[in-house]
């Protein structure tokens, strides 16, 4: 059974991005539950889609599974991967839209600040116990 916390975290981020009103439309999509990644083409009327994988690192899902779910042929993805090339090329036309696919958010250098903030919270709790 799926833990709802993962979905809630993504939906909270989507709401925060929507609140900034920098993009015409912001929609969450998921690998294993609706709305699915392939639904991104019908989830918006926007002609351009920027797909940002909410993963801590680039790995199997981000470099193989998601490009295939976005319509990239599996054989092409595997061939590019074996050659050490990116498995997605920006922008790529799919279903009448242009799709840009980014790296996982965990590759963002600013994430260090979030990690340190959490560590400081832990250190603060520890200092109260000592």
Where are these regions (language model features)?
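Active-site-proximal alpha-helix that buttresses catalytic centers in soluble enzyme cores
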Residues: 1-130
């Amino acid at each position: 059974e799926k833990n709802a916390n993962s979905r809630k975290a993504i939906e909270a981020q989507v709401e925060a991005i929507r609140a900034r009103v920098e993009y015409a439309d912001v929609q969450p999509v998921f690998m294993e539950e609706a709305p699915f990644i392939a639904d991104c083409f019908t989830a918006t009327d926007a002609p351009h889609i920027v797909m940002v994988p909410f993963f801590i690192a680039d790995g199997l899902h981000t470099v193989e599974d998601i490009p295939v779910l976005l319509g990239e042929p599996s054989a092409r993805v595997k061939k590019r991967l074996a050659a050490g090339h990116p498995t997605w090329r920006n922008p790529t036309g799919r279903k009448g839209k242009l799709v840009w696919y980014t790296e996982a958010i965990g590759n963002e250098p600013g994430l260090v600040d979030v990690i340190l903030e959490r560590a400081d919270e832990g250190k603060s709790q520890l200092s109260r116990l000592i």
